[in-house]
Amino acid sequence: MIQISTTTGPTTEPITTAQAKEHLRVTFSDDDAYIDALITTARQVVEARSGMRLFTQTVVLRADYWSEIGFSDPHRLDLVSLRVAPVQSVTSVNYYDDDDIDRTLSTALYWTDLDSVPCRMQIKDEWPSINERAGNIRVTMVVGWDNTDNIPAILK
């Protein structure tokens, strides 16, 4: 089963309370907390439906097997789809080996393609052997745009 969870949420929203109030033509402050909650909810819905993370945050992609998140093209380029975009960086790739030891995959063993949507990882040789533990593979990533000005208007 594939799961993406947020471990560190964004520190800001794609639009400000003032921008939302201007759009709604609200001139009083009584409902500011409610408007802020609506902004957060709207961002979360956009992120869930689009797979795009709007502002910098840390997420963990969990999977049971490499094949769940991977695919192979005809040239045997074993790729893993990171399922979210934009990805600023892959912080770590952890897995439990055959002896049930938590290992970190060396960055020297894979490439990342962070410009594709969805972003991808490609193993240089072959994926390491893993055990059958649920949630065995954990890919930790920093995702989202680093500046609200870079977020496409259609997603705001």
Language-model segments: what does each one mean?
Residues 1-156:
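Divalent metal-cofactor coordination and adjacent catalytic microenvironments
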